[in-house]
């Protein structure tokens, strides 16, 4: 039986709507982790498809400056993986949450304990950007009997046979990395990006979402046209931190019709 995240996103896709997943950094709030539920419910009320929740880490190799600084602010507020897990247990939401964490915090906590402790929460997906596919066996056995999907990240420079290998048996969605580089680096797109996304669609039987560098209305339109939806991180994180209005951008993303 498909996992909840797969079913939820497939239903949005089947309805002819674009999938929209904002990223937030846990603990990057004036109230620290006490403000996490407030942010999640703010986004839920705007109708987002799912929410990616980042765990702060001192060496975030895939993150650009906006998210790296958010992580440092979160750590300064005293955020820990243990405290985040305890906070997630208290948050009630109908929106699937997807945890984005580097492997080190997960390893320090204990993969099996982490998965068990999140079993009764809204967490339905897990992204580990620095975990090679060849080492997925460090995590996958603990997820097998849970409702948490391990999300594959696929570079659009990856050949089709490798793409098939990366997404075989995957649930939730495929995270298509739109740029070569770190998050938030807008506009540095390959000339053949659309062709690579079309190729990825041919081999994926779950939704394909585009992320890394998606930050403008033009980006939303472009990537919704060639993938099943988008993930937006740096723009959301910056707006929430600086108190900038972000509602209209999110509403436009949520309302996108295929």
UniProtKB/Swiss-Prot annotation:
<feature type="active site" description="Proton acceptor">
    <location>
        <position position="63"/>
    </location>
</feature>
<dbReference type="InterPro" id="IPR011060">
    <property type="entry name" value="RibuloseP-bd_barrel"/>
</dbReference>
<dbReference type="InterPro" id="IPR018204">
    <property type="entry name" value="Trp_synthase_alpha_AS"/>
</dbReference>
<dbReference type="Pfam" id="PF00290">
    <property type="entry name" value="Trp_syntA"/>
</dbReference>
<comment type="function">
    <text>The alpha subunit is responsible for the aldol cleavage of indoleglycerol phosphate to indole and glyceraldehyde 3-phosphate.</text>
</comment>
<comment type="subunit">
    <text>Tetramer of two alpha and two beta chains.</text>
</comment>
<keyword id="KW-0822">Tryptophan biosynthesis</keyword>
<comment type="pathway">
    <text>Amino-acid biosynthesis; L-tryptophan biosynthesis; L-tryptophan from chorismate: step 5/5.</text>
</comment>
<dbReference type="GO" id="GO:0005829">
    <property type="term" value="C:cytosol"/>
</dbReference>
<dbReference type="GO" id="GO:0004834">
    <property type="term" value="F:tryptophan synthase activity"/>
</dbReference>
<keyword id="KW-0456">Lyase</keyword>
<dbReference type="InterPro" id="IPR013785">
    <property type="entry name" value="Aldolase_TIM"/>
</dbReference>
<keyword id="KW-0028">Amino-acid biosynthesis</keyword>
<comment type="similarity">
    <text>Belongs to the TrpA family.</text>
</comment>
<dbReference type="InterPro" id="IPR002028">
    <property type="entry name" value="Trp_synthase_suA"/>
</dbReference>
<keyword id="KW-0057">Aromatic amino acid biosynthesis</keyword>
<protein>
    <recommendedName>
        <fullName>Tryptophan synthase alpha chain</fullName>
        <ecNumber>4.2.1.20</ecNumber>
    </recommendedName>
</protein>
<feature type="active site" description="Proton acceptor">
    <location>
        <position position="52"/>
    </location>
</feature>
